[in-house]
Amino acid sequence: MEVNCLTLKDLISPRQTRLDFAIEDAENAQKENIFVDRSRMTPKTPMKNEPIDLSKQRIFTPDRNPITPVKPVDRQPQVEPWTPTANLKMLISAASPDIRDREKKKELFRPIENKEDAFVNSLQLDVAGDGAVDEYEKQRPSRKQKSLGLLCQKFLARYPSYPLSTEKTTISLDEVAVSLGVERRRIYDIVNVLESLHLVSRVAKNQYGWHGRHSLPKTLRTLQRLGEEQKYEEQMACLQQKELDLMGYRFGERRKDGSPDPRDPHLLDFSEADYPSSSANSRKDKSLRIMSQKFVMLFLVSKTKIVTLDVAAKILIEESQDTPDHSKFKTKVRRLYDIANVLTSLALIKKVHVTEERGRKPAFKWIGPVDFSSIDEELLDVSASILPELKKEAYGQIRVCAKERLVRYGSFNTVHTSEKIQRKVSSEPSSPQGERQGSAYSLEIGSLAAIYRQKVEDNSQEEAFVSNTAVPPASILDPALSMDSEYCVKPLAQPVFSVAQTDLPAFSAQNGPSGQVGVPVPSAASDTENLKPALLAGQPLVYVPSTQLFMLYGSVQEGLSPESRSEEDGGGSDVPADLSVTPSAQKRLCEERDPQEEEDEPAMKRQSQEFEDSPLSLVMPKKPSSSTDLACPVTMGNGSSPPLEDACVKGQLPAAEEVTGKAAPNCYVASECGNPARNPDTEKPSNENEITKDPSLMQYLYVQSPAGLNGFNMVLPGTQTPHTVAPSPAQLPSFGVPCMFLQSPGLGPFPVLYSPAIPGPISSAPGTHPNPGPMNFGLSTLASASHLLISPAAMVNPKPSTLPCTDPQLRCQPSLNLNPVMPGSHGVIHPESPCYVRHPVSMVKAEQSPAPATPKSIQRRHRETFFKTPGSLGDPVFRRKERNQSRNTSSAQRRLEISSSGPD
């Protein structure tokens, strides 16, 4: 009876729909019912399976209604055997969510299931655990909730847009994926787009650092420039024009003229033949990050700020390779959608539709920042790992910050041991110094050797460059003022390097008769030398870049009161030879450090160095640490030391204060010996770009040292009429100039060289004036008579002399006062080096030195220089006095110290 009741119920229900459905899914239902629920095949089997089973029977006729269930024995011949394939299908059907979703959708669209619970019993044969699956599917997020745009908004909400510079936020992709309830691969898409805009940076595997939007405008400005270099705007215009032409062929008017079919492949070819895409063939270049940067470039270079999706896809995706396989092209278009979703979440673009003749096309409009005029023009360092495809085409524009001041010339050779000395000096313990971080030093030292090697091989061009260099004319010095001198020296903090004497070639230069110079200036000038070609054209200044010798020479005009112009040197430099220069007169000179160094290095560090001067004659040693290379024949004079004068150490006067028209009393004073009515002039820093009023009044030779090779700084005032320099020694010109060598405080044993003496015959008569004889820079005439001043300490600034000089050669030497604060403390400045002479000597080799330097004193000075701390920086005069008392001095120096009490 129960079976009959079920049959009647089945007849009442709309069986036709269920029967159709059963026939449709007969095979799947048969497999599931037979192999899964064989144990349940009882007379209570639902009517859902009866039509399926009976329809498969060949003996089934409409007259035979299934009153009783069919026995399993009757169906055995028609059943497929139990195979692994059938088992796999069953497992897939049970476990795959997609298959279950399809089954659910099919059931929802069945009319019988939209009515009453007519088939409650049919649900009894569902897969075991299906109720739990339904609960799980209720918890699963919808497609909208899983969208990348919404996920990116949730991701960005976790971090501040403008984080503080002090706080460092680290993003763990695993934690974020668990927190947001998504897979980690979804977070990868977001992070790659954010990394392309420098909002995040990779720290480690699955670890990123959050930077925020601080550098976003600069990044967009950089991408805009790169997009302009890639000519993306022209490519978009070309593609749009091709599409317009295609529409013209399709709709009309050109077909009448026998023009080709619009489906012609030539018309549909948007390949990269005419406008090659910047995409490369490597896998990294096709990454989502690179595509994101290019996608942003399209918006930044577009005039309308609207980019359609198909144009972006044709430009950014290599259609020439993917044209046969449209599935790959569509996949990459989906990646553009992913990028657009993230950019939309960042509020940089929004989705719009462009209406054309064919209909609406998806497009995106840029709503982010467009005005980059207020942004600093300095380019971001777009590394090759981020934009490798732009490295070849836009390399010169990306590395604008790389100044080409590391170029050297083959005429100046460098000893390789100087780099070892620099590394040794840098490794010593010393007071903290600000590092040079300007754009002028952006090139690494590792590339220095390659640049040098290349320049050494190109000697012919370099010699031609030096031979074409113009040197302004120098006027004869006034004899009445020839021995007046004022020196304002600021201590430098570069390491000292010395090289062999044989490394100095003849300095070739050509004097210009008009005082105008024409020197090719490199396109990428350093920050420390703000010398424009216009300035060079109007000022008697010669600027020779990237050599190892730094010289500044000048002369005063005949008949006029000498004036001094100060030049700032752009850093230390190597002296390529043991140079002993004979001066014909003294003049007021001031040397300052690089303004970038003045800002970086602490003021107390600059104040800690002093300069002493005493007349000495010395040949520069080949090695700073060698104690036997000081060739100084000691010949004492009449025993009287030069008088003392107030010393004014130049400490921390900023370069901005030293402008024309404003006196700097702490930098120089006028010497009244010989011409008391001489008026002091002010200093002119070269970085102020102030042109002298009288171009013929002062001439300077400025030779810049390459970055990273810091050494001596040489100041040479020229006092000779112009001579043409020829390679032969007989035709070499002569410069009778006092010279000053400023050493680095890092290597204390090496002395400061200062030459106030004169070349030629020196008369012992008090009234005779020096003869401004010639001095050649050639090796054959390099040995000349000179007085040199040696001191590893700092050099002080002389003031007007009030006491007469007993030495005829030093008749007009200004006296020195060691302490301007304490006028009572007078004492003779004795040299740090044991070598002390008063008479001119010629340059000799190291083995001719009768008085070698004491290694003990040299080593002591070396330690004192490095172990100065800012806490111990007091008055430099007191420190020097204590250092002089505690230093091991020679007998000659002690005698000088005793005799110094006379002028007091």
From Swiss-Prot:
Transmembrane segments: none
GO molecular function (one): DNA-binding transcription repressor activity, RNA polymerase II-specific
Residues in the DNA-binding region annotation: 143-212, 283-368
Function in brief: Atypical E2F transcription factor that participates in various processes such as angiogenesis, polyploidization of specialized cells and DNA damage response. Mainly acts as a transcription repressor that binds DNA independently of DP proteins and specifically recognizes the E2 recognition site 5'-TTTC[CG]CGC-3'. Directly represses transcription of classical E2F transcription factors such as E2F1. Acts as a regulator of S-phase by recognizing and binding the E2-related site 5'-TTCCCGCC-3' and mediating repression of G1/S-regulated genes.
Pfam (any one): E2F_TDP
Triggers of expression: Induced at the onset of hepatocyte polyploidization.
A biological process from GO: negative regulation of G1/S transition of mitotic cell cycle
Residues bearing PTM Phosphoserine: 96, 411, 833
Inactivation phenotype: No visible phenotype; mice develop normally and live to old age. E2f7 and E2f8 double knockout embryos die by 11.5 dpc of massive apoptosis and dilation of blood vessels and show increased expression of E2f1 and Tp53, as well as many stress-related genes.
Protein name: Transcription factor E2F7
Oligomer and partners: Interacts with HIF1A. Homodimer and heterodimer: mainly forms homodimers and, to a lesser extent, heterodimers with E2F8. Dimerization is important for DNA-binding. Interacts with MN1.
Keyword Protein biosynthesis: no
Source species: Mus musculus
